[in-house]
Curated annotation (Swiss-Prot):
Enzyme class, spelled out: oxidoreductase
Gene designation: Steap3
Positions on the Vesicular side per record topology: 229-258, 326-358, 412-433
Annotated signal sequence range: none
The name this protein goes by in its record: Metalloreductase STEAP3
Subunit structure, as described in the record: Homodimer. Interacts with BNIP3L, MYT1, RHBDL4/RHBDD1 and TCTP.
């Protein structure tokens, strides 16, 4: 009984961020840090909180000691590298040469390079920072790690930042040591290969939303085109033909007319590549031929295009709420009331217009609600909690429902205006008629693909069937039956 009572109630184990338990050595392992900048301070804070004994090497320890946690020992660089086997090099590339005097003391140790070059430095040097550090200290083992983790993520913990730590190096044991340290700190290590991969890893923090560049340019291009079109119709035409000054509409009214057009076309462009891919597979009779590069890139950017569509739809809703707040709108109401009095009409009520307004506003709210659901489920944490069938149902089925609701919203908004001559200003059709072309083609194509003759064939192709793929299977020689042919 006494033996049971002698056991500690809580074992020396830490809980990782994913819920698993990681053993912590009885004696805290000692880790060295060379550097006293922001990243070095955040790294020291995280290491101390994870149970490591931290020694910080600084050129002026008295001045920087107050910036580090009290449990971290701040001393001169020579003393900091004497005992730890793992040393984080948290200095810039141009300062690597200042560490050459420590080469003898660093021999045989693991150097973890956490630096990132600037865009200019990356273009100037052929070697990555990690490879350059390895060339200066050939007796050391250099591992590239933690360069994609920000100082804030180190301080706040992996729950508030990116959990992945990209690691590359030439020695497996050294990478394993750094990986275990990353796990103890609550991060998820990801092996990126040899040290030659460091150049690619160092380029990651320099990228500015690479997957958003083309969708953003597309959205801006559509906005400029539709804005210019609406400006000609709503502002320029009245000024030239009727000498009416309506330039006050440019900041809000013309923008609000443009936003739904951009959102609607972008939503159509999310589902158009799927239609083109299905048509291409039906034409080829196989799924084993690669799509053209332009279609492949288009398919990969659907998420960004959809989120931009949601963004413009939300702006359209907010701008619409602001329309009654305009001074011009109040003047229009007063002028309408004066005209009603002069016409000696006690009640102004157009049943058709009332129903049209009620219906198209309701459809617009429903479409925005569907887009909101699509945007929420595209968040990685929520998307990862869904299985493939659930995710496909939300993004494909409900997304197509959102496109249908948007089309009905646009049709009820336009009503009969497309057939009225006075709405063709400068012989230009109403803007909504231009936006309807692409969605109607997509809806028609989707309807055709639902026909049994096309639906069954497309399903077979996506399950591996090929139109011209006749595979011959030969039975054993002693078998009574002859040759058999099967289509795969």
């Amino acid at each position: 009984m006494s033996g049971e009572m002698d056991k500690p109630l809580i074992s020396r184990r830490l809980v990782d961020s994913d819920g698993s338990l990681a053993e912590v050595p009885k004696e805290a392992p000692k880790v060295g840090i060379l550097g006293s900048g922001d990243f070095a301070r955040s790294l020291a804070t995280r290491l101390v909180g994870s149970g490591f004994s931290v020694v910080v090497g600084s050129r002026n320890p008295k001045r920087t000691a107050g910036l580090f946690p009290s449990l971290a020992q701040v001393t001169f660089q020579e003393e900091a590298v004497s005992s730890p086997e793992v040393i984080f090099v948290a200095v810039f590339r141009e300062h690597y040469s200042s560490l050459c005097s420590l080469a003898d003391q660093l021999a045989g140790k693991i150097l973890v390079d956490v630096s990132n070059p600037t865009e200019k430095e990356r273009l100037q040097h052929r070697q990555s920072n990690a490879e350059y550090l390895a060339s200066l200290f050939p007796a050391c083992t250099v591992v590239k790690a933690f360069n994609v983790i920000s100082a804030w993520a180190l301080q706040a913990g992996p729950r508030d930042g990116n959990r992945q730590v990209l690691i590359c190096g030439d020695q497996l044991e050294a990478k394993h040591t750094v990986s275990e340290m990353a796990r103890a700190m609550g991060f998820t290590p990801l092996d990126m290969g040899s040290l030659a991969s460091a150049r690619e890893v160092e380029a990651i923090p320099l990228r500015l939303l690479p997957s958003w560049k083309v969708p953003t340019l597309l959205a801006l291009g559509l906005f400029v085109c539709f804005y210019a079109y609406n400006f000609i119709r709503d502002v320029l035409q009245p000024y030239i033909r009727k000498d009416e000054n309506k330039f006050y509409k440019m900041p809000l009214s013309v923008v609000n007319t443009t936003l739904p057009c951009v959102a609607y076309v972008l939503l159509s462009l999310v589902y158009l590549p799927g239609v083109l891919a299905a048509a291409l597979q039906l034409r080829r009779g196989t799924k084993y031929q690669r799509f053209p590069d332009w279609l492949d890139h288009w398919l990969q950017h659907r998420k960004q295009i959809g989120l931009l569509s949601f963004f413009f739809a939300m702006l359209h809703a907010l701008y619409s709420f602001c329309l009654p707040l305009r001074r011009s709108h109040r003047y229009d109401l007063v002028n309408l009331a004066v005209k009603q009095v002069l016409a000696n009409k006690s009640r102004l009520w157009v049943e058709e217009e009332v129903w049209r307004m009620e219906i198209y506003l309701s459809l617009g709210v429903l479409a925005l609600g569907m887009l909101s659901l699509l945007a929420v489920t595209s968040i990685p944490s929520i998307a990862n909690s869904l299985n493939w069938k659930e995710f496909s149902f939300v993004q494909s089925t409900l997304g197509f429902v959102a496109l249908m609701l948007s089309t009905m919203h646009t049709l009820t908004y336009g009503w009969t205006r497309a057939f009225e001559e006075n709405h063709y200003k400068f012989y230009l059709p109403p803007t909504f008629t231009l936006t309807l072309l692409l969605p109607c083609v997509i809806i028609l194509a989707k309807g055709l693909f639902l026909l049994p003759c096309l639906s069954h064939r497309l399903t077979k192709i996506r399950r591996g069937w090929e139109r011209d793929g006749a595979v011959k299977f030969m039975l054993p020689a002693g078998h009574t039956q002859g040759e058999k042919t099967s289509h795969v």
